[in-house]
Amino acid sequence: MVTRTFTAVLHKEEDLYVAECPEIGTVSQGKSVDEAIANLKEATELCLEEFPIPDIHPTLMTTFEVAFSA
């Protein structure tokens, strides 16, 4: 069994949190952040059981500034 660390990107939609794993492409949701991450972990594990792990490159996350008219 192989253990890997993946990225979870979360955002809130109305009364749910949506969680996405950009490296694998899995998405799930939950009523709390913890539930969304747990559901994403389960979805990702199921996906990796069925499909070979893709060639994964580390995700680089940063911030940037944008000027716009408000």
Task: List the predicted regions and their residue ranges.
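Short, charged, surface-exposed hinge/linker loops at domain edges
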Residues: 1-5, 9, 38-70
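Short aromatic/hydrophobic contact patches that present stacked aromatics
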Residues: 18, 27, 65
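Short histidine-centered beta-strand/loop micro-motifs
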Residues: 19, 29-30, 56
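Short, surface-exposed helix/turn micro-motifs that flank interaction/cofactor sites
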Residues: 20, 37-38
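A short, exposed loop/beta-hairpin motif centered on an aromatic-Gly-Thr core
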Residues: 24-33
